[in-house]
């Protein structure tokens, strides 16, 4: 994501010690890096996930981190893992982050699920921040999908925070059907 105030570029990703490893001690973590020169060079990767996941590419791995920028340059990142959907933030261009992830939603059935006819289905989060000049400026939105209502009922969910990610509104189901359908 690009911070349009200063043109900094922020990226986050999952690092696997050894992809699909079952070796104890191998883990996944979320890393952050930034460029202040249009991508010519990058800062050393910084770990922003305090709780690691497993290296098995599934619900217990930490994955899906995509940054968003707030109106004053805040960096917001959510991702999914064994502890559900979590959030971290930086208010100083990525130099420091919260000391522990903030829980958003338990994602009771995880982010990796089956949908007939698809090789793979993931309900990983997307994080956005309202940068408009309207009344919702600064509101952080996170949406994802999961199968909490049954294995044949994939639904789309959203939550929002109006205080920089300190607290989160109750999770809302977005799709309006009440049937066993995949969204």
Cite the ranges covered by each PLM segment.
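A conserved active-site cap/scaffold subdomain adjacent to cofactor or substrate pockets
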Residues: 120-147
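Asp-box/BNR beta-propeller loop motif
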Residues: 33-55, 83-115, 149, 154-179
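Signature of short aromatic-glycine-proline-rich micro-motifs recurring in repeat-based ectodomains
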Residues: 1, 59-68, 115-128
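Hydrophobic strand positions within the blades of repeat-based beta-sheet folds
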Residues: 11, 32, 77, 87, ...
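Entry beta-strands of beta-propeller and related beta-repeat scaffolds
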Residues: 5-12, 72-77, 133-142
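Asp-box/WD-like beta-propeller blade repeats and closely related beta-sheet repeat scaffolds
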Residues: 1-31, 44-64
């Amino acid at each position: 994501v690009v911070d349009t105030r200063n043109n900094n570029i922020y990226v986050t990703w999952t690092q696997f010690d050894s992809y699909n490893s079952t070796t104890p001690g191998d883990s996944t973590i979320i890393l952050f890096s930034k460029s202040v020169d249009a991508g010519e060079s990058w800062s050393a990767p910084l770990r922003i996930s305090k709780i690691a996941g497993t290296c098995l590419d599934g619900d217990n791995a930490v994955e899906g981190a995509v940054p968003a920028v707030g109106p004053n340059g805040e960096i917001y990142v959510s991702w999914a893992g064994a502890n559900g959907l979590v959030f971290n933030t930086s208010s100083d261009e990525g130099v420091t982050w919260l000391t522990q992830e903030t829980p958003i939603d338990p994602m009771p059935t995880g982010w990796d699920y089956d949908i007939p006819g698809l090789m793979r289905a993931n309900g990983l989060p997307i994080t956005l921040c309202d940068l408009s000049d309207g009344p919702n400026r600064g509101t952080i939105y996170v949406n994802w999908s999961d199968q909490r209502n049954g294995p044949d009922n994939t639904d789309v969910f959203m939550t929002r925070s109006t205080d920089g990610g300190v607290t989160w509104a109750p999770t809302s189901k977005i799709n309006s059907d009440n049937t066993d359908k995949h969204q």
